[in-house]
From Swiss-Prot:
It comes from Oryza sativa subsp. japonica (Rice). PROSITE patterns: G_CP. Belongs to the TRAFAC class YlqF/YawG GTPase family. NOA1 subfamily. Residues 24-57, 72-91 are annotated as: Disordered. This is Putative nitric oxide synthase. Residues 81-91 have a biased composition (Basic residues). Keywords: NADP, Oxidoreductase. PANTHER family: NO-ASSOCIATED PROTEIN 1, CHLOROPLASTIC/MITOCHONDRIAL (PTHR47569), NO-ASSOCIATED PROTEIN 1, CHLOROPLASTIC_MITOCHONDRIAL (PTHR47569:SF2).
Length: 547
């Protein structure tokens, strides 16, 4: 049996001091008083004699209590550690390498066909002089000269670009924003409001404040009242339960509303970086150019930044990575971010060569079917919107009218529904474009997505609703329900289930169809549009809109 280890003198004394009870001092007999003794007597010990806890016992009890508390709090500590790890991982995704100032792609000299390619000699020269932030990659040079070079793969069966940027990948790229102190500017295209309204934006922004900017209001039909548009947008935002600081109606082309956005950015920025977010081709790069052009009059930093601004193009996926722009004199940077490519938009299914046909270049003009009251009714007919949309009117009131708002390059054709299938097979790629050309039509996926719509006519003096086609435009359903003087028509209207419209809408399979309240466009809209009646408290909570 091994002998117990010998303790040093100091260890013995420490052990004895912890084990022995603390000696009590005897009271001074000369100053003893029974009353004073009763008031100053120490509290009775927990035990008497050998049962009294020693200092060692109290120390052990304290340690055991601390360990028990640690076990109770361990899950919370583990959760905090997990959040810290996620934050570090997300912040590590923040781009730090040199990137093309036109598209944000990391500069590289290996693959000439990939985004971000720069000739090795140019790269070495710019790197030697610390000028890599002034380099434009080969793809952006071609885009700036009008070439349609996509970097985004399609969903419609056509070969896409070399680098496909999906929504999930972009969410991963921008995940660090949740942990940054930033001001978020979210852009939405008014022509494609539902299709370009980026869902789950809080996945990017976290708790950072958001300013909502509506772009391309200059494309709305002439004589449109922007007061009605602003109220309609705010009502839609409230229904989507997105909390924003304010709503701005803007046009990057005419600079309408841009000054108001800049003023609010300067007020809310407070030294933070500013990020421009939005789906692909809502006009982020054009909006940044308009901002820099407006700010250049008073801010020399913004004036200098105009020389190296992001490339603008009709191609989805022009911007491939966050682009840092030195735009503010008072601190903080401006970032143009990649557009989120949504699979449910028309741009995801058509060929890159056909993309310009989806972008309106001038004010939208209403195209009505039937054009007037003397024309044949819609029941039993099918309307083709280019080769991308087919609307079968199964049942409608005699005075129902469908009004199309979208790109002028897409023609509208009406044929009897019984002949619609044969007409589409014969004319797709010829009369019905996009897809343009028989070669593209052979690889076309067709109109496989079908949605049945039952629309009730609520009032006869205003449109019943809009049918919005994601990535294209919208169709206003207008029941011209003026009482008819023809008794046969009146009887037919009464038999038609008290004013119900039955439509069958065909689109490419991934494309979404939205039924929404009618967008108040045109001169007559200010007469039929009704503003929401709100209490003072509701009015205070609603975001304000500006233009």
């Amino acid at each position: 049996m091994a002998a117990p280890p010998l303790l040093s003198l100091s260890q013995r004394l420490l052990f004895l001091s912890l084990s022995l009870p603390k000696p009590q001092l005897a009271p001074n007999p000369s100053s003893f008083s029974p009353t004073r003794a009763a008031s100053t007597a120490p509290p009775p010990p927990e035990g008497a004699g050998p049962a009294a806890p020693s200092r060692g016992d109290r120390f052990l009890g304290t340690q055991l209590a601390a360990e028990a508390a640690a076990r109770v709090l361990a899950p919370e500590d583990a959760e905090r550690r997990r959040r810290r790890r996620e934050k570090r991982k997300a912040l590590a995704r923040k781009p730090s390498a040199a990137a093309c100032y036109g598209c944000g792609a990391p500069l590289q000299t290996a693959d000439e066909a990939a985004p971000g390619y720069v000739h090795p000699a140019t790269y070495d020269l710019k790197k030697r002089h610390h000028q890599l932030r002034t380099v434009l990659c080969g793809r952006c040079k071609l885009l700036s000269h009008g070439h349609m070079i996509t970097a985004v793969g399609g969903h419609g069966g056509y070969p896409g670009g070399k680098q496909f940027v999906s929504a999930d990948q972009l969410r991963d790229k921008l995940s660090y924003l949740r942990h940054e102190k930033a001001l978020i500017i979210k852009l939405v295209d008014i022509v494609d409001f539902n299709g370009s309204f980026l869902a789950r934006v809080r996945d990017f922004a976290g708790a950072n404040p958001i300013i909502l900017v509506i772009t391309k209001v200059d494309l709305l039909p002439r004589d449109t009242d922007l007061n009605c548009i602003g109220d309609w947008v705010v009502e839609a935002v409230v229904k989507k339960k997105l909390n924003v600081l304010s709503v701005h109606l803007t046009s990057s082309k005419s600079l309408v509303g841009v000054t108001g956005v800049i003023s609010e950015i300067q007020q809310e920025k407070k030294g933070r970086d500013v990020y421009i977010l939005g789906s692909a081709n809502v006009g982020k790069s054009a909006f940044i150019s308009a901002m820099l052009r407006t700010m250049a009059y008073k801010d020399p930093v913004a004036a200098a930044a105009q020389k190296y601004k992001p490339i603008q193009s009709a191609v989805p996926g022009t911007t491939l990575g966050p682009i840092q722009i030195e735009a503010f004199l008072g601190g903080g940077k401006l970032y143009d971010t990649p557009g989120v490519h949504l699979h449910h938009r028309q741009a995801a299914v058509i060929h890159a060569d056909d993309l310009p046909s989806l972008a309106p270049q001038s004010r939208l003009r209403a195209r009505c079917f039937p054009a007037n009251d003397t024309d044949v009714g819609l029941s039993g007919n099918s309307l083709f919107w280019g080769g991308l949309v087919r609307i079968d009117v199964v049942k409608a009131l005699p005075r129902t009218r469908l009004t199309f708002y979208g790109p002028k390059k897409l023609k509208i054709n009406m044929v009897p529904t019984t002949e619609a299938d044969e007409f589409y097979e014969r004319e797709v790629g010829v009369t019905l474009t996009p897809p343009a050309g028989k070669e593209k039509a052979e690889g076309w996926v067709g109109l496989q997505g079908v949605r049945e719509l039952q629309i009730k006519y609520e009032e006869s003096d205003r449109p019943a609703c809009d049918i919005a086609i994601s990535g294209l435009g919208w169709v206003a359903v207008e029941p011209l329900g003026v009482p008819s003087s023809n008794p046969d028509e009146s009887a037919e209207e009464e038999d038609n289930e008290s004013g119900e419209l039955h439509l069958r809408v065909h689109v490419p399979k991934p494309v979404e169809i939205f039924v929404r309240p009618p967008l108040p466009v045109g001169k007559a809209a200010s007469q039929w549009y009704r503003y929401q009646e709100l209490t003072e408290e509701e009015e205070e909570l609603r975001p304000k809109w500006h233009y």
